[in-house]
A protein has these predicted regions:
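Single-stranded nucleic-acid nicking/binding segments centered on His-rich, glycine/basic loops
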Residues: 1-59
Length: 59
């Protein structure tokens, strides 16, 4: 997913299973809103989901 995303997820205690879920959500998402909604369904705050999306994209 990239060094910035990996560092963020590690620093915030995301475990391998959660990281796999995030990767899958990113691969399946059409845009940032879709991605954030998918993560929200798993309990991630929308704003954090949007931020993670930008980290993965490298924005």
């Amino acid at each position: 997913m990239g060094a910035r995303a990996d560092d963020y997820l590690s620093a915030h205690g995301y475990r391998p299973g959660s990281i796999q879920l995030i990767q899958k959500a990113y691969e399946e998402a059409d845009n940032v809103d879709d991605f954030a909604a998918k993560l929200s369904d798993e309990g991630v705050v929308i704003a954090e989901g949007r931020y993670i999306y930008t980290l993965i994209r490298g924005d």
